[in-house]
Regions:
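Acidic/histidine-rich helix-loop elements
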Residues: 33-47, 102-113, 145-153, 227-236
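Short, positively charged and aromatic/hydrophobic N-terminal segments
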Residues: 9-13, 18
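Histidine/acidic residue-rich metal-binding segments in metalloenzymes
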Residues: 117-137, 143-216, 237-258, 290
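Histidine/acidic-residue-rich catalytic or RNA/ligand-binding cores of hydrolases
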Residues: 34-39, 184-190, 223-234, 244, ...
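His/Asp/Glu-enriched, well-ordered alpha-helical/loop segment
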Residues: 241-303
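Metal-associated gating/positioning segment near the N- to mid-region
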Residues: 23-84, 103-106
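Divalent metal-dependent hydrolysis catalytic cores, especially in the metallo-beta-lactamase
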Residues: 50-78, 89-99, 131-144, 173, ...
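Active-site environment of divalent metal-dependent phosphoester hydrolases
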Residues: 29-33, 74-78, 100-101, 140-144, ...
Length: 303
């Protein structure tokens, strides 16, 4: 499987080629390669592979990307990319590593905390270490073989509220990996700055995001790029994508903020892919450019 969009195996469709002249990706993982997460992480086991990082940054530069927001990793790969990005005329933002609750999703890539006191200390340390923002993991993943199913429930609303409050008190914007209507609603009501993924939302969750100025980064590529791969149930993948695209359209119609982010590095999502723009354009129609430009500008303002 190709891991960079400039690879010969990647052929853009006409809708992808007609997308925006100045591109940004508001959710990537420099440490991952879109094919094999264990192999990708091992690439940096002896220290950050600068050759890899430069190759990825060059790919984004050639495709016209000017802004990248990393979801973080605990091996300092995103931090290295940030230090080099200026050479490629790219603004790069990173939380350094995401923070996840012990026993819950995210430990494969992030730092674990056992309680709120430990989390607060980690947030303070992020300030000292130079993080641009805080990334929290507050839910599980979609089960791509079963529509409507998540791999685990979200954290309790009161915990979500405290996580966001602590980070805001330190002066950080907060990016939240969040799926499920109640989890996203709780995060939005607590003032989270952006929601990543956001599967299976309902009207209450969408309104909460709209009323609280939450930017939604739906990462449709993590679903749409699974089609035809044979890895998951095709009917389930199609249903999950349809649900997400319907919610994207509904959120835009109510004036919500939506920004493009591929989750590049996730399986079947190569760095530099323009698939997110194509999927969002399909969901948003002729207003796509205006909607996404507005959302992307807000991400860049907040983060």
């Amino acid at each position: 499987m190709a891991v960079l969009a400039q690879s010969a195996e990647i052929c853009y469709t006409k809708p992808e080629r007609k997308c925006f002249p100045v591109r940004c990706d508001c959710h990537i993982h420099m440490v991952l390669d879109g094919a094999d997460w264990k192999r990708a992480i091992a690439r940096h086991s002896g220290g950050v592979d600068e050759v890899w990082v430069r190759r990825v940054l060059e790919t984004y530069q050639k495709l016209g990307f000017a802004y990248l927001r990393d979801g973080g990793d605990r091996w300092s790969v995103g931090a290295k990319a940030r230090s080099l990005a200026g050479e490629y005329s790219i603004t790069y933002r990173t939380p350094l590593s995401p923070l996840c609750a012990q026993g819950h999703y995210g430990g494969f890539i992030g730092e674990k905390y056992e309680n709120l006191s430990q989390y607060a200390a980690m947030v303070t340390q992020k300030r000292a270490d130079g993080a641009d923002f805080i990334k929290i993991m507050i839910s599980g993943l979609m089960d791509f073989d079963r529509f409507g199913v998540l791999t685990e429930d979200g954290l309790p609303p009161e915990t979500i509220r405290e996580l966001i409050h602590i980070a805001h008190e330190e002066g950080f914007a907060v990016m939240a990996h969040a799926n499920g209507a109640r989890t996203v609603e709780a995060a939005a009501l607590a003032g989270v700055d952006s929601v990543e993924h956001g599967a299976y939302l309902d009207t209450d969750a969408l309104h909460a995001m709209r009323e609280n100025g939450t930017v939604w980064v739906p990462t449709l590529s993590t679903i749409g790029n699974l089609r035809g791969t044979g890895r998951f149930d095709e009917a389930a993948v199609a249903a999950i994508l349809e649900s997400a695209m319907e919610n994207v359209a509904a959120f835009a119609a109510m004036g919500g903020l939506i920004a493009p982010g591929t989750d590049a590095g996730a399986w079947a999502v190569p760095h530099g892919s323009l698939s997110e723009y194509a999927l969002l354009k399909q969901a948003l129609g002729e207003n796509a450019e205006n909607v996404l430009s507005r959302g992307a500008a807000e991400i860049q303002r907040k983060f």
